[in-house]
Amino acid sequence: LKKRLAHTHCRHAVVGISGGLDSTLALLVTVRAFDMLDMDRKQIMAVTMPCFGTTDRTYHNACELVHRLGATLEEVDIKEAVTLHFSDIGQDPSKHDVTYENGQARERTQVLMDIANRLGGMVIGTGDMSELALGWATYNGDHMSMYGVNASVPKTLVRHLVRYCADTADSQTLKETLLDILDTPVSPELIPPEDGEISQKTEDLVGPYELHDFFLYHILRFGRHPAKVYRLALQAFEGVYDAATILRWLKTFYRRFFAQQFKRSCLPDGPKVGSVAVSPRGDLRMPSDACAALWMQELDEIVE
């Protein structure tokens, strides 16, 4: 990021802040890059965009994080804009389907891009490698940025990095904020909360990230076959997940990994910071219409 900022002569960065892990790490990385360039942290525009699914907890943590890091906070409530958009396209706002969710994500990206244009800055992407592998991102929504700093960082590593930042924080308030973010359920917060609490929990929907990151590592780093990945997972997660659970989420991984390649085929630039990546310009050159049938067939032949 430091190199990209210097190369483009950008004096401003724009980061969407949700109060979740990924946007937290993206902001921490951006702050570090600005410090290395001797640039004022106030030139980092951290934008919180509350909407239908935003909870008080994540909103408070987002604002507190920006304040403690010394960046500039801008709040853009997108409820009215999204409601008008739904009216324009004939979307029933009481129908919480994929259009309801993606409309919010794309509105947020539009806001960030336009603020970046206003400032002559760069939108910093927040999505991590685990989300990209699963396609757990809105096409041309949070999927898009001008530079994705987390693009090769798996979700499990995001958590460790944020915890490291909490452990080495220079203020108790910043540490407490980071620890509360770590303790918050992973969620895109696109569905209204229940009794003020997050109702949409990512790992309930797509499976545990520690499993998916394990699958991703062995598939991309070593090219292991599905049955081999399954056997390794049985050993690695013995006593944590039973065989049926591992097989269920491994099938989910392969199904989504193949079906969602079209999102990875047009990823923005980002650094490779580990041993595997899903960039079409790097480790993963895969056609968007590749079929998962052979891999799924091998999994279907497994007898638990």
PLM regions and their residue ranges:
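ATP/NTP-dependent adenylation/nucleotidyl-transfer catalytic domains that generate, transfer
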Residues: 1-19, 23-304
